[in-house]
A protein has these predicted regions:
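Alpha/beta catalytic cores of nucleotide-metabolism and tRNA/nucleoside-modifying enzymes
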Residues: 1-29, 169-181, 187-217
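Conserved N-terminal beta1-alpha1 strand-loop-helix module at the mouth
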Residues: 1-84, 138-139, 143-146
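Hydrophobic faces of well-ordered beta-strands that scaffold small-molecule active sites
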Residues: 6-14, 39-41, 58-63, 90-92, ...
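Short, surface-exposed connector motifs at secondary-structure boundaries
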Residues: 28-36, 121-124, 148-153, 175-179
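Alpha-helix-loop-beta-strand connector modules within alpha/beta enzyme cores
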Residues: 43-67, 102-129, 162-189
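Catalytic cores of alpha/beta
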Residues: 50, 70-81, 132-143, 166-173, ...
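Glycine-rich phosphate-binding active-site loops on the catalytic face of alpha/beta enzymes
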Residues: 61, 65, 84-99, 146-161, ...
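Conserved anion-binding
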Residues: 79, 89-151
Length: 217
C-alpha cells in the first residue's frame, strides 16, 4: 500500500485544547496537499475552517469530547451547531457511565438523536475501547449497527490508551460491512497506519502521518 493510499484514509487531526487558528489553517493546508480524507478539529474552528477550505476538504468535528458524559440534549445541540457551521462528518463520544450501568436503550436513544441531527452526514461513534471489556465493545458494535451509523471509532486519544490491533480486529469482526471502523489514538507511523487498514479499519485518526509522509519526500 503506497503512502498516498494510506493518507487518503486519514482524518488529519488536531484536538489539543490549546490549538490556535494558525495551527488549524496549517492542518487544513497539509490535509489538502496530501489528500487526506478530512481534518478533525475542535467545534469552535469548524465555521472558520469550512470557509477557509471552500469545499476542497471535508471538515470533521467532535461531539461530547473527550469524556462523553454531556447530556444527550447538549450533544444534540452541539451536533446541530456543528452541522450549521459546515461540518461534513461528526465524531461523537458515547457515555461510558451508561455502558457500565448497562443502560443500552439510553445509549441507543442518544446515538439515534445525534444521527438525526447530522442530517445525513456520516456519524462516527467513539466508544473508548481502553475503558471497556470485550463484551461491552461487542454490545456497542451491535447497537451502532442497529442505528446504522457510518463508523465505530476506537478512541478519543485523550484517555488511558488508543487503538490496538486487537481492538480493531474485534470491532471489524462484530460489525456488518455497512459500518466501518476508525482506528484512532497512538498511530504514529505509516507502518502503523497500513497495519490498521490491513486489519479492516477504513479510517485513521492521526496527527503524525502527514509529517511522516513529508519526511519520506
Amino acid at each position: 500500500m503506497d503512502t498516498a493510499t494510506i493518507l487518503s484514509h486519514v482524518d488529519h487531526t488536531l484536538l489539543k485544547p490549546e490549538s490556535t487558528w494558525e495551527q488549524i489553517k496549517t492542518l487544513c493546508d497539509e490535509a489538502m496537499e496530501f489528500g487526506c480524507a478530512t481534518v478533525c478539529i475542535p467545534p469552535s474552528f469548524v465555521k472558520q475552517a469550512a470557509a477557509y477550505v471552500q469545499g476542497n476538504l471535508k471538515i470533521c468535528t467532535v461531539i461530547g469530547f473527550p469524556n462523553g458524559y454531556n447530556t444527550t440534549a447538549a450533544k444534540i445541540f452541539e451536533t446541530k451547531d456543528a452541522v450549521e457551521n459546515g461540518a461534513s462528518e461528526i465524531d461523537m463520544v458515547i457515555n461510558n457511565g451508561l455502558v457500565k450501568d448497562r443502560q443500552w436503550d439510553d445509549i441507543a436513544h442518544e446515538i439515534a438523536g445525534i444521527k438525526a441531527a447530522c442530517l445525513g452526514r456520516p456519524l462516527k461513534v467513539i466508544i473508548e475501547t481502553c475503558l471497556l471489556s470485550d463484551m461491552e465493545k461487542i454490545k456497542l458494535c451491535q447497537l451502532a449497527a442497529k442505528e446504522e451509523v457510518a463508523y465505530v471509532k476506537t478512541s478519543t486519544g485523550f484517555s488511558t490508551g488508543g487503538a490496538t490491533r486487537e481492538d480493531v480486529a474485534l470491532l471489524r469482526e462484530n460489525l456488518p460491512a455497512s459500518v466501518k471502523v476508525k482506528a484512532s489514538g497512538g498511530i504514529r507511523t505509516l507502518e502503523d497506519g497500513q497495519a490498521y487498514l490491513d486489519l479492516g479499519a477504513d479510517r485513521l485518526g492521526a496527527s503524525a502521518l502527514v509529517g511522516e509522509a513529508r519526511k519520506q519526500g
